[in-house]
Each structure stands twice: as structure tokens, then as C-alpha cells.
Amino acid sequence: MIALYPGSFDPLTYGHLDIIERAARLFDRVVVAVLRNPAKVPLFTVEERLSQIQKAVRHLDNVEVEAFHGLTVTVARRLDARVLLRGLRAVSDFEAELQMAQTNRTLATEIETLFLSTSTEHSFLSSSLVKNIAAAGGPVSHMVPEHIEKELRTRFAGAPL
């Protein structure tokens, strides 16, 4: 069975990676789909995020990474994915995620949404938090893989504090 894990991943955190690694044990194939959203200005380009994630998951043979735009269910259908994966950090995530799952269900009744709770040690993480801390010169090595930490440091080098 194929599972699709969509998101912006700007940047990928250890929380995201935890979900990907656990999903890789549950499914035959996991596709990490990086959102290309022209309405948002990301810190990293789609190409940079694809590269970051590919490097982080290279130890997982059944995980692929690709970019997408448009409806998630359209991508899922194209890939023949029957499951959309979503990570939940806290109860506060649930309401928005449930609404999205119900919306996706109305668009594609054959596709299920599976919620995986983030491991406790990563439950506080978000890409926004990582960017804010990195922008202020704070440590993020416990939040993101080393290669992403280096890219964050480079991106924010010389940024005003």
C-alpha cells in the first residue's frame, strides 16, 4: 500500500522525519510530497526542500520525495496512494487536520487520512519555530538534521537579530 505524506516542510524537522520513518515501517511505499504554493514565500525553494528531504531519508529504501501543487487528493490518485498521512503534535492540531481530512474525504472517498501522533520528544517542534530560533541565532541542532541546520545558518548569516 502507498501512503502520501504532504506538507511544505520548510524546513523538514525531526518531527517530520519521525513520522516518515514510522510510516516507512507501516507501508510498502511512502511518498513525501513537498507543496509548491505560489501564494506563500518559503524560506527554502521547493528544489532546496526536495534535496534536504532526500538527503534525510536516503536510509529508507521505500521512501520517495517529489514536489506537487494543486489538490493533495489529485496527487494521491495519480500515485495510487490510498492513505494520506498527517502528523499530530497536540490537540490543537486536531481540529484543522480533521477539517482537512473531512474535506479530502468529500473530494476522494477512496482515500483515507491516517493521523500519527508525533513522538513526545518532538511534540513541540514546528518549522516556524525552527526558523524563528535559527533567525535569532539560537541552537536548532536538536530540531533538524545536521545538513538542514547548516543551511539555516547559511541562510540567516548576517541577518539582523
From Swiss-Prot:
Statement: the UniProt record of this protein carries the keyword Signal: no
GO molecular function, one term: pantetheine-phosphate adenylyltransferase activity
Annotated binding of substrate, by residue: S8, K40, T72, R86
GO CC annotation: cytoplasm
Gene Ontology BP, a term: coenzyme A biosynthetic process
Stored InterPro entries: Cyt_trans-like, PPAT, Rossmann-like_a/b/a_fold
EC top class, as a word: transferase
Reaction(s) catalysed by this chain's protein: (R)-4'-phosphopantetheine + ATP + H(+) = 3'-dephospho-CoA + diphosphate
Keyword Zinc attached: no
Annotated metabolic or biological route of this protein: Cofactor biosynthesis; coenzyme A biosynthesis; CoA from (R)-pantothenate: step 4/5
Binding residue positions for ATP: S8, F9, H16, G87, L88, R89, E97, H122, S123, F124, L125, S126, S127, S128
EC assignment: 2.7.7.3
Pfam family, one: CTP_transf_like
Cofactor entry: Mg(2+)
UniProt keyword terms in alphabetical order: ATP-binding, Coenzyme A biosynthesis, Cytoplasm, Magnesium, Nucleotide-binding, Nucleotidyltransferase, Transferase
Role this protein plays: Reversibly transfers an adenylyl group from ATP to 4'-phosphopantetheine, yielding dephospho-CoA (dPCoA) and pyrophosphate.
Annotated PANTHER family: PHOSPHOPANTETHEINE ADENYLYLTRANSFERASE
Listed name of the protein: Phosphopantetheine adenylyltransferase
Species the sequence originates in: Gloeobacter violaceus (strain ATCC 29082 / PCC 7421)
